[in-house]
Every structure is written in C-alpha cells, then in structure tokens.
Amino acid sequence: MTLILGIDPGSRITGYGIVRDTGRGGCIYVASGCIRTGAGELHERLQIVYRGVREIIQTYGPVTMGIEKVFMAKNADSALKLGQARGAAIVAGAEESLEIAEYTATQVKQAVVGTGAANKEQVQMMVMHMLKLTSKPQIDASDALAIAICHAHTRSSLLPHGLGTARSRGGRLRL
C-alpha cells in the first residue's frame, strides 16, 4: 500500500493531503492540513512552502506526489506566484526522491466527482465520502486530498499496463 502526497499549491496557503492507496481502487485517509505562509516577502513565503512540504514528506514518508498544474488566472501576477509556490513544493519532493505527477484541476475534479465542472464544495463532499471522513477538511486540504486520490487512481490505471513509474522517466510524470 503506497503512501501518496497531494499538494494544492498557493503562495499564501498550500494544502496537503496524504492517503494510502489500497491497490484495490480505494484510498485510506492518513493526514491533511495547510501550510500557511502569512504576509511576508515572497522569497520568505516560498521558503516556508518548501520547508513545510519537506517536513511533511520526512514525517509521513510518501513515495509519490501529485500536484496541481498552474491554471491561467486573470491576474498574471497571481499565476506567477502560484507557479513559484508550485516550484518550491516540486523541489522539496524531488529532493526527497519522490516520483512527481502533475494534474490539471479538471483532471482532479473528473477523477473525484465525475465531472470537470465540479465546484470546490462538491469536491470536498466527495473527498469526505471517499475517505469516510466525519468532518469537513479545510478547502485547500480537501483539494490536496482530491489530488492525492486522483494520483492514486491514475497510477493504478497506468502501472499495470507496463508504463513504468515516473522515476523511469526522469522523476516527473505529466498527465
């Protein structure tokens, strides 16, 4: 049973979620939460994201990580900051030798809810149902858990077909 880390990156709040892939199409909740960076300088916030993700990896020991791709925001500055936070999380995962896969928000919603047009509340409710949670996780943590679930489902559909792991392709799997 593989431990999977899901990351919902943000320059102020980065959600994380860890699930155990049962290998039978299901996942078991392990942990979730948010890395909050406050309102400091961007380089300080990126350092907090990097250190926070690295600490989570060292604490729980996941072997693979799914992370959300950057979407095109109306505000270019916000998209750039989001991309930088993503980069900090990816470097933390790479330094800990995790295989890393990237997913669009639409792919995650499709995998968890069944439609790429789902809203955050629908994703949150399906995450609660799939992981048998008794209370609502924070939205950013819920999104990260959804990314981890998406990664578990994608891995299980790819790996049996002889496509290998992301590691065999240089550490990053783009889907």
Curated annotation (Swiss-Prot):
- Quote the cofactor binding remark: Binds 2 Mg(2+) ion per subunit.
Query: Which residues are listed for Mg(2+) 2 binding in this entry?
Result: E68
Q: Which residues bind Mg(2+) 1?
A: D8, D140
Q: What PROSITE patterns does its record include?
A: RUVC
Give the family, as the similarity comment puts it: Belongs to the RuvC family.
Under the heading HAMAP family, the entry gives:
RuvC
Q: What is this protein called?
A: Crossover junction endodeoxyribonuclease RuvC
Organism the protein comes from: Pseudomonas fluorescens (strain Pf0-1)
